[in-house]
Amino acid sequence: MVVVRLARGGAKKRPFYSMVVADSRNRRDGKFIERVGFYNPRATGGEESLRIQMDRLTYWQSKGAQLSDTVSRLVKQFGRQQKAAQPQE
């Protein structure tokens, strides 16, 4: 089964996560098919904390990929950020 999940990177006590499409049998930080975004929980100031390539994510979902619980939460958060960033008419 193909899943979209977070793969941990970064240094000790400074996590950085890549949002990857991977086979569920592979290790968390192991081999993956495609990187579709990132999440930086320790972003400060003007740094970008979350980026998702929504076109690629919807493509993989159409192919049957399942989102992990955390990725589902982050996708909703990203949608709210995008909606808030759009200028009001």
From Swiss-Prot:
GO terms for molecular function: structural constituent of ribosome. Pfam families: Ribosomal_S16. GO terms for biological process: translation. Keywords: Ribonucleoprotein, Ribosomal protein. The keyword Disulfide bond does not apply. InterPro entries: Ribosomal_bS16, Ribosomal_bS16_CS, Ribosomal_bS16_dom_sf. The keyword Nucleus does not apply. One of its GO terms (cellular component) is cytoplasm. Belongs to the bacterial ribosomal protein bS16 family. This is Small ribosomal subunit protein bS16. The gene is rpsP.
